[in-house]
Amino acid sequence: MAAVVAATRWWQLLLVLSAAGMGASGAPQPPNILLLLMDDMGWGDLGVYGEPSRETPNLDRMAAEGLLFPNFYSANPLCSPSRAALLTGRLPIRNGFYTTNAHARNAYTPQEIVGGIPDSEQLLPELLKKAGYVSKIVGKWHLGHRPQFHPLKHGFDEWFGSPNCHFGPYDNKARPNIPVYRDWEMVGRYYEEFPINLKTGEANLTQIYLQEALDFIKRQARHHPFFLYWAVDATHAPVYASKPFLGTSQRGRYGDAVREIDDSIGKILELLQDLHVADNTFVFFTSDNGAALISAPEQGGSNGPFLCGKQTTFEGGMREPALAWWPGHVTAGQVSHQLGSIMDLFTTSLALAGLTPPSDRAIDGLNLLPTLLQGRLMDRPIFYYRGDTLMAATLGQHKAHFWTWTNSWENFRQGIDFCPGQNVSGVTTHNLEDHTKLPLIFHLGRDPGERFPLSFASAEYQEALSRITSVVQQHQEALVPAQPQLNVCNWAVMNWAPPGCEKLGKCLTPPESIPKKCLWSH
């Protein structure tokens, strides 16, 4: 019955495509879906977004042949919550990927985290199965590493990659090296079977991830619609690239990583064209959060004209590069000023498959097909959360900050700075400043760097405040926060003995189990 419903809805979508002058011919076949998610890549890292060295020819061509979003946002300024939001279509405050351990703290999933994606959340690959999709994740999962959080338990059919970031190397005594999985079992660990040379920056991981993507596309292209989630992490510090790309960028080691990713994406798009499935494959490129300026320039990217970076709810922390490519459907050379969100990829992907989101829960993602296919703009807010705290909201061109904070004085004095060289008096604060009674409001069109707040006495301020306040009140009145998943840590749950370790002789002995509150210092 579900297959019949899916087919019926796909036929309805075909009628929409035909009405837009972009119809398909032959039997109804939902398009393949390919989501390219980068790690800590900034808005200003692509040539098409103004990066002066212009070392991303394939991504720039993807933009020229498709649609570019200059106003596209992650759902959080950190990796894990943003990825959970993409795959659920829901804000982290709704899907549980936040902490209540301290006010306005960011949180993610290091290997000592106890929590992960709850079974109650319905992920995109689970829902796409109803329309016959085969799904694979390549790269970084980051939604929990314990067995109950495994991606194959949440709808994916295949996985090659890791549950955590590639930090290390560790001594396998105080802390284990991070495992790499093929499907259900580990096949090695970072810095062991999958070496990363921290001194030179050399690692072959992006090439491995590229081959995994190419092989999957070749196997599936003629049989079933596929969903490929390509979540590479070469641009997350410590950044890496394979030997042919090392030393090739004007931007140092980070630029080498970007160049290799760009080359890989070019090869993926070329394969789609060679297999004659490009016109039946929707491709979307974006990043999980802003560039980590604390690691720049050698280990971090650029957020263009925007303030601060990863870890913050200023534009540099959550405004992302975003490109849509679907030959024959998305008109080439478009720029859309639609406010977009990473959560929209959930709802849009379901619409492409002829499916609708679950009706028993709040969904924050919009269906962007009217924008992609017909150029329509839709009103919507962007909410900027840090932990369980709504820090800011954007509506139209205006952004209101209810709280401001970069990082604590304690960490700042230790050299941790998420806004290096970007001090804005009264805005980039090292104390958590409460503006809820009189928010700071910026016009992002005139002031994308959030340096000049509107005068409280101006008519523009009063009008913007009224509109944003109304939307925020509606949001907060309807909000039902999920149980926080990122509160408890325990060294005993780290990657000591992942599934498959016995076959490799890689099992390690865990320490005593001592659950405790995670310390989120920022």
From Swiss-Prot:
Residues 1-26 form the signal peptide. Changing P420R: In MPS4A; reduced enzymatic activity. Changing G116V: In MPS4A; reduced enzymatic activity. Changing E185G: In MPS4A; severe form. Its EC number is 3.1.6.4. Its main location: other. GO terms for molecular function: arylsulfatase activity; metal ion binding; N-acetylgalactosamine-4-sulfatase activity; N-acetylgalactosamine-6-sulfatase activity; sulfuric ester hydrolase activity. Changing S80L: In MPS4A; intermediate form. Changing S287L: In MPS4A; severe form. Changing H166Q: In MPS4A; severe form. Changing A291D: In MPS4A; mild form. The active site is at C79, H142. It is linked to Mucopolysaccharidosis 4A: A form of mucopolysaccharidosis type 4, an autosomal recessive lysosomal storage disease characterized by intracellular accumulation of keratan sulfate and chondroitin-6-sulfate. Key clinical features include short stature, skeletal dysplasia, dental anomalies, and corneal clouding. Intelligence is normal and there is no direct central nervous system involvement, although the skeletal changes may result in neurologic complications. There is variable severity, but patients with the severe phenotype usually do not survive past the second or third decade of life. This is N-acetylgalactosamine-6-sulfatase.
